[in-house]
Amino acid sequence: MTIITPITNDPTTALLRLMAWLSPVFPVGSFSYSHGLERAVHDGLVVDAAGLQDWLQWLVRRGSGWNDAVLCAESWRCAMKGEDLHEIAELAEALAGSRERHMETMLQGGAFFAAARSWPCEIFDRLPPDCAYPVAVGAVAGGHGVPLAQALAAFLQAFCINLLQASIRLSVTGQSGVTAIMAALEPVLGETAARAALSSMEDLGSATFIADIMAMKHETQHSRLFRS
């Protein structure tokens, strides 16, 4: 059967697809993950809006957010060039630094793969159904011809928004604090998306060790709201 892939050169269509795929209501289960933030709050490392903003900006610039953006960009390029996606998928899975981080990225990736099939595309024939979330997002965006810079900016913003939503449930800040942080993070997201668009696999690397340790410690946390 021939699959017609709706490649878009229309910026409005690209925007609508990104808003749909990375919306908090897109069925990937992102609301159930805190990426270790819950443990950081529990241990007193993030106690207010200022600390939360600092936590997020370093995850994006030098932590798991950055690595995911690099993986997303490489997956986008593989999709655009018609290259095999299995190698990047295996690397992305191997980079998950803890059991819950692995669960978070793999379950979201699989859910994204399934839900995004509502937009038919040949990329689903080349993409492993069990793949990490940034690989799934990057490959699908590339398969549909969504511009890379826009895809990366939207991906990073969705990453932060999910943790901001978690911060409200954790009583770190309220809605006014969240909107202020969203506005303050715009330059960080734009700059990081631009860097990631020009990145290669050699640019992978993280320096947010405390955040990684919090994700590990969360695995044994007795009382919790989130799966990670």
UniProtKB/Swiss-Prot annotation:
Function: Required for maturation of urease via the functional incorporation of the urease nickel metallocenter. Disruption of the ure1 gene cluster suggests that it protects brucellae during their passage through the stomach. The major route of infection in human brucellosis is oral.
InterPro entries: UreF, UreF_sf
GO CC, any one term: cytoplasm
Coiled coil: none
Record field: transmembrane: none
Gene behind this protein: ureF1
Pfam (any one): UreF
Protein name (Swiss-Prot/TrEMBL): Urease accessory protein UreF 1
Complexes and interactors: UreD, UreF and UreG form a complex that acts as a GTP-hydrolysis-dependent molecular chaperone, activating the urease apoprotein by helping to assemble the nickel containing metallocenter of UreC. The UreE protein probably delivers the nickel.
Localization of this protein: Cytoplasm
Primary location group: cytoplasm
Molecular-function GO terms, alphabetical: nickel cation binding
This protein's UniProt keywords: Chaperone, Cytoplasm, Nickel insertion, Virulence
Protein family (similarity comment): Belongs to the UreF family.
